């Protein structure tokens, strides 16, 4: 990832840092239009997720999370930007003529060869079941349910680690720090997701944030009492409570939101940090 630093020619470009290396020219048979409805609203039109709305129109890229082209080698043809995720994607041309997008593994370059199957080398970008991987392997795009496709460790720079295998299950340490059990028959991709420097980007101006579909964030302490529990007071006043709360009065900053009784609790050996 090449970070391009803007010159301070205008206030909006001061200290800006963007990635100017990867472009987007998707294949027409691997994209389709999508209507992003809601913008943070529920079925009643009430805001349930704040600071969302607007943004540039997007085309969805069909990503192959299943990697079910077994024992057929594929070659990386392009590395492209995807507006629907912070990781890059790469176009794969398989030997049987199939063309698919996958998540870009860190370090992969155009011309590299990848393959998926049961008896494939443990090398970057190859996909295989957890039972065929040695302990300590760095992996991403991990299946939870067999055949459903990868659901874990798909963000830019994400990587999990295979730390144990016992019985029918494998123990993984996920990017969040959570340690959980996964069926050994589930598949994963070797290596780390690319674009690890995504957190080094500096948009530099509010307009760039709006293009991404993110609206301005207003602090509750500067609102009126009718709008937020932190609002009101004369001048710059404290929040007036022992602990900060959400606009609806619930505890904020660290409250556990996971259901107390969930079916997957038995698979989690250690909660996330």
Curated annotation (Swiss-Prot):
SUPFAM superfamilies, per database record: Nucleic acid-binding proteins, Translation proteins SH3-like domain
Sequence intervals crossing the membrane: none
Gene Ontology molecular-function annotations: RNA binding; rRNA binding; structural constituent of ribosome; transferase activity
Classification via InterPro entries: NA-bd_OB-fold, Rib_uL2_dom2, Ribosomal_uL2, Ribosomal_uL2_bac/org-type, Ribosomal_uL2_C, Ribosomal_uL2_CS, Ribosomal_uL2_dom3, Ribosomal_uL2_RNA-bd_dom
Protein's UniProt keywords contain Chloroplast: yes
One BP term from GO: mitochondrial translation
Subcellular location, principal: plastid
Domain of life: Eukaryota
Subcellular localization(s) per the UniProt record: Plastid, Chloroplast
UniProt xrefs under Gene3D superfamilies: 2.30.30.30, Nucleic acid-binding proteins, Ribosomal protein L2, domain 3
Keywords: Chloroplast, Plastid, Ribonucleoprotein, Ribosomal protein
Record-level GO cellular component terms: chloroplast; mitochondrial large ribosomal subunit
Parts forming coiled coils: none
Pfam family, one: Ribosomal_L2
Subunit structure as annotated in this protein's UniProt entry: Part of the 50S ribosomal subunit.
NCBIfam families named in the record: rplB_bact
HAMAP family found in the cross-reference section: Ribosomal_uL2_B (MF_01320_B)
Name of the protein: Large ribosomal subunit protein uL2cz/uL2cy
Organism this protein belongs to: Amborella trichopoda
Lineage start: Eukaryota, Viridiplantae, Streptophyta, Embryophyta, Tracheophyta
